[in-house]
Design a protein with these regions (language model features):
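Conserved short beta-strand element of beta-propeller blades
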Residues: 19-46, 51, 64-85, 163-173, ...
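Residue-level signal for WD-repeat beta-propeller blades
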Residues: 10, 37-38, 45-46, 55, ...
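Enriched but not universal
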Residues: 1-20, 30, 36, 472-477
Length: 477
């Protein structure tokens, strides 16, 4: 029977519900990083040796292998989920099959669990461009993935990427080998990544931000179309009238037609033309494309400084960005960061002057009401944007989650909730939790979960409380 949601503001009051508590209480630095895949698992990192996965379908927690993070766990630790997995391989954006058939892909990965229901994207080789649901897979060394039967057999020239969760975690304290690691869901492994290029010490508060192309059970396109022509380093759609440079640092993927499967970072854009690194196969007028967030980039901000860092997953390397305008002031305790890409206002969705996908919004925290945003395409900060009323301040203990047009905020450890309307630049009270929580601690343990049944979508906001094992959720009405 289809789900219907008859809840209405004023008529129906929002209610906080208690859900399964975690087995260990939150401490300074503890955080939850949300996977945006269809199962919506939540990674809870509580110390250098403790990590748990929350499954909202079952309302249950399970302990994971130790993160074995270097450093001293405290305020400043951060994590984020990416959309695409390369297993235990680092400095790569894809994997290569060892063989296969029309319905199987032989891998060199040791897959530890069933990936049925997740997806696999064929980047090049036979059947290039298709994104297929995983029917089943073998467990263990050199796992074999089964998909629906395709026109051609997969071979050792098949290049692919797994659409399964992978979490990137940055520890706190003095950085050393093991401070920056990834947890790969498919292989159930932690792998050390490079931290060269980051500050020597991580503290205060900080956030990792991803800009993935995949959301829930499909690609989240900012724009799409069919090319009218291309060169070795460009893709042209002469029917477009884009604002110059609006797509810089986004990503273009050839969905079908000539060059299908290829993915490139956009380095320049004009009214009709995207510039990219050299194509392996030059697209043409048959090439259907999508422009999305960039799967290769992670951003790190915080640490009591205005400096903004960017990590390349394919390069396993950090760089320090030099924005045209620097952030006006450093973020502090209780800061936030959210990549905004789902605003429904037409000003934001206009493809010729797109705003969705361009901005990372960040409340500064540190007993401040200020909010700034980083423009990804323009590589610049816009500081202290005007909104009303800008009277509530946020600091240690504040928790945030972004969904659609709004950023949801729990202030400090007061149980008071607010909802920041992004396109309207307005702050509203949301309600107050009638519960008791412990002392305020740095670390974001708030997230959102979607329930979907056909066209019906119901969103819940969850929060694991300050210095507590207790977790609650509330339906968005």
């Amino acid at each position: 029977m289809p789900t219907t949601n008859g809840n209405r503001p004023i008529l129906d009051l929002k209610r906080w519900e208690q859900v399964t508590p975690s087995s260990v209480a939150t401490i300074a630095g503890a955080f939850i990083a949300s996977s945006r895949h269809f199962r919506q698992q939540q990674l809870y990192v509580r110390s250098t040796t403790e990590a748990f996965l929350y499954n909202p379908n079952e309302d249950g927690w399970v302990q994971l292998p130790s993160p074995a993070l270097a450093g001293t766990f405290a305020a400043g630790a951060a994590g984020v989920s990416g959309a695409w997995s390369t297993g235990t391989t680092v400095a790569a954006s894809t994997l290569t099959a060892t063989g296969g058939s029309t319905s199987t892909i032989n891998t060199n990965q040791t897959i530890a669990r069933s990936l049925a229901g997740y997806s696999i994207h064929i980047v090049s080789g036979p059947n290039a461009g298709v994104t297929l649901s995983i029917v089943s897979n073998t467990i263990g060394t050199n796992s074999v993935i089964t998909v629906a039967t395709q026109a051609s057999a997969f071979t050792s020239s098949t290049v692919y990427r797994l659409c399964t969760p992978v979490w990137y975690v940055l520890g706190s304290g003095t950085l050393a080998s093991g401070s920056f690691r990834k947890y790969d869901f498919a292989t159930n492994t932690w792998t050390t990544l490079v931290n060269t290029g980051l500050p020597a010490t991580i503290a205060t508060d900080g956030k990792l931000i991803a800009t993935p192309s995949w959301y829930d059970d499909g690609y989240e396109a900012l724009a799409s179309g069919t090319a009218t022509s291309a060169t070795g380093t460009t893709l042209v759609n002469s029917a477009k009238n884009w604002t110059a440079s609006q797509w810089v640092n986004s990503q273009v993927r050839i969905v079908s037609g000539t060059g299908a499967g290829q993915i490139r970072t956009i380095t320049a854009s004009t009214a009709t033309t995207l510039t990219v690194a050299t194509w392996t196969i030059t697209p043409d007028a048959t090439s259907v494309y999508q422009i999305t967030g960039n799967d290769d980039f992670l951003y790190y901000m915080g640490n009591g400084a205005v400096t903004l860092f960017r990590y390349s997953i394919s390069g396993n390397s950090w760089s320090t960005l030099t924005p045209v305008a620097a952030r006006a002031a450093a973020p502090s305790t209780g800061m936030s960061a959210a990549w905004v890409r789902q605003v429904t206002d037409t000003t934001w969705t206009d493809e010729n002057a797109i705003i969705n996908g361009r901005r990372i919004y960040s409340f500064r925290g540190g007993v401040s009401a200020a909010i700034d945003y980083y423009d990804i395409a323009a590589n610049t900060w816009v500081s202290a944007i005007t909104y009303a009323p800008a009277t509530e301040t946020f600091t240690t203990g504040s928790k945030y989650t972004y969904y659609g047009n709004f950023i949801y905020i729990q202030k400090d450890a007061t149980n008071r909730w607010f909802r920041f309307n992004i396109p309207a630049a307005a702050m509203d009270g949301w309600n107050t939790m009638p519960v008791v929580q412990g002392a305020a601690v740095v670390g974001d343990t708030c997230f959102d979960i979607e329930y979907k049944d056909g066209a019906t979508e119901i969103v819940y906001i969850y929060m694991l409380m300050n210095t507590s094992t207790q977790m609650y959720r509330q339906m968005v009405i």
